[in-house]
């Protein structure tokens, strides 16, 4: 295969333009990840529930590489995120993965991020792939470093039984952010959403932070729809993004409280009785802003 697997199925995260640090409030996990990458012949696997920001931590690593805020031993490395489903698609997963392995033998200073790495463990038609053996040459030379990511359930189901993988890959537990951390994450996400949509959130930092606190509180654990099984920060980010979408739908270049209200009342992330209660809080918490903008909050029966 002559084409580059890295270029076709991967994304160079070190070439992405980051408006803000993608890994807000994740310094502890980032340090742990960097320490593993600095350990000879060791790779890392990030393990945590869906939607808690495992990919954001790897993006945070790429961001630090861009800034040069990284130990000298890792300077000059590129971080590639590879699309796992595309590697195992069309029943030729073995060919594509082997082509990737062979390509990496010719590369230097590559950090390969494989999300949903458990999918590759079962990609072979003749049983689980021995990923540690396949990447062994690059790992031994120290020129290729691997980061995997998976959920707690998939780690226990697929990975724990592969003793060679467990020896090579240091497990890094990624916890759900606290409410305070999630507020920080949402605040730092606003510039990115403004850039993506061309729509501004035009309030003072004090009002913005109160908006984020409200969104985070209304999507706290026991208020979430169980079947969605999403966590902080994703479940809160969904509501924030919906407010920006509502402004775009209205052909506005600013997010107003009308759009935040629409996002809150229409969210599928929390139960209907929660929405009713939270709208009462919303109406009182932002009373002055709602009156100023002429927004009437109706509480569903």
What are these regions (language model features)?
Residues 1-301:
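AAA+ P-loop NTPase nucleotide-binding core of proteostasis motors
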């Amino acid at each position: 295969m002559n084409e580059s697997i890295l270029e076709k199925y991967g994304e160079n995260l070190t070439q992405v333009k980051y408006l803000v640090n993608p890994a807000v409030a994740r310094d502890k996990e980032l340090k742990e990840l960097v320490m593993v990458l600095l350990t000879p012949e060791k790779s890392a696997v990030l393990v945590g529930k869906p939607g808690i920001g495992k990919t954001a931590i790897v993006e945070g690593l790429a961001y630090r590489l861009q800034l040069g805020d990284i130990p000298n031993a890792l300077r000059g490395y590129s971080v590639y995120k590879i699309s796992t489903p595309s590697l195992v698609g069309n029943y030729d997963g073995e060919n594509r993965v082997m082509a990737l392995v062979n390509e990496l033998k010719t590369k230097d200073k590559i950090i390969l991020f494989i999300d949903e790495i458990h999918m590759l463990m079962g990609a072979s038609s003749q049983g689980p792939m021995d990923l540690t053996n396949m990447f062994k040459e690059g790992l031994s030379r120290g020129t290729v470093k691997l980061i995997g990511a998976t959920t707690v359930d998939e780690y226990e189901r697929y990975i724990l039984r592969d003793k060679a993988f467990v020896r090579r890959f240091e497990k890094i537990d990624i916890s759900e952010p606290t409410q305070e951390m999630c507020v920080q994450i949402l605040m730092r996400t606003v510039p990115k959403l403004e850039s993506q949509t061309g729509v501004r959130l035009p309030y003072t930092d004090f009002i913005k932070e109160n908006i984020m606190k409200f969104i985070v509180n209304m999507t706290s654990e026991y208020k979430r729809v169980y079947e969605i099984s999403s966590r902080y920060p994703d479940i809160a980010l969904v509501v924030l993004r919906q407010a920006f979408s509502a402004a775009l739908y209205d052909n506005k270049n600013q997010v107003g409280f009308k759009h935040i209200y629409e996002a809150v009342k229409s969210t599928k992330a929390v139960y209907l009785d929660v929405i009713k209660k939270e709208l009462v809080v919303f109406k009182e918490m932002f009373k002055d802003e709602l009156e100023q903008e002429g927004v009437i909050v109706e509480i569903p029966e």
